[in-house]
């Protein structure tokens, strides 16, 4: 948002299954998580936040998530969609994996009016890029030196999910990762993304080798 771009957050799962307080879970935790998400988004300058109704913990069908993401793409008409990389070998968080896979699937749904009509929505929209974060194969880098402190502050607002030590540890990891990625492009701190254009998204396996 600092660069003048309009950003929308789409939160797929409701966070009901995990808290720093083991006695806090279920619907009560969902309400807290949503309030924390809104505060964190506002701090980052994001006012458009949508919550999907999927239970935390992966007990849902990935195809259902893809349909909902596709509907939001048609509604919001974004230039780019950002999602966790589902192809990282070490990633074991099922919600991250399913969300990333659903984002991939939605890329072949939202551009086609006939597909969207089959899931109950008129219209279509083709994004210009799908960018994966939490990736081990970045090919696009964005400098984050000017916004790095806001990331830590936004993370600290998720008090039901992270205690102070966890926030500190995560931010230390972010610092080390951003410094390492920044060195690749000689621009201080940077975030890395695995970015795909529409050309790369279908019947183009060489993109896995060439898009670097």
Where is each model-derived feature located?
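Active-site rim/loop-helix segments in enzyme catalytic domains that contact anionic ligands
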Residues: 1-76
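Metal-dependent de-N-acetylase/amidase catalytic core
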Residues: 60-212
């Amino acid at each position: 948002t600092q660069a003048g771009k309009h950003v929308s957050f789409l939160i797929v799962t409701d966070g009901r299954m995990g808290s720093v307080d083991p006695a806090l879970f279920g619907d009560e935790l969902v309400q807290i998580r949503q309030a924390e998400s809104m505060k964190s988004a506002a701090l980052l300058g994001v006012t458009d936040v949508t919550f999907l109704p999927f239970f935390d913990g992966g007990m849902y069908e990935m195809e259902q998530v893809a349909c909902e993401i596709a509907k939001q793409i048609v509604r919001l008409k974004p230039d780019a969609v950002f999602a966790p990389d589902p192809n990282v070998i070490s990633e074991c968080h099922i919600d991250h994996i399913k969300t990333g896979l659903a984002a991939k699937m939605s890329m072949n749904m939202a551009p086609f009016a006939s597909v969207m009509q089959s899931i109950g929505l008129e219209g279509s929209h083709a994004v210009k890029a799908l960018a994966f974060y939490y990736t081990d194969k970045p090919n696009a880098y964005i400098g984050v030196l000017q916004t790095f402190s806001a990331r830590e502050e936004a993370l600290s607002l998720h008090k039901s999910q992270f205690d102070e030590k966890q926030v500190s540890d995560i931010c230390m990891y972010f610092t080390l990762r951003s410094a390492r990625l920044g060195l690749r492009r000689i621009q201080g701190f940077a975030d890395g993304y695995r970015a795909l254009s529409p050309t790369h998204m279908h019947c183009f396996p060489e993109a896995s080798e060439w898009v670097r």
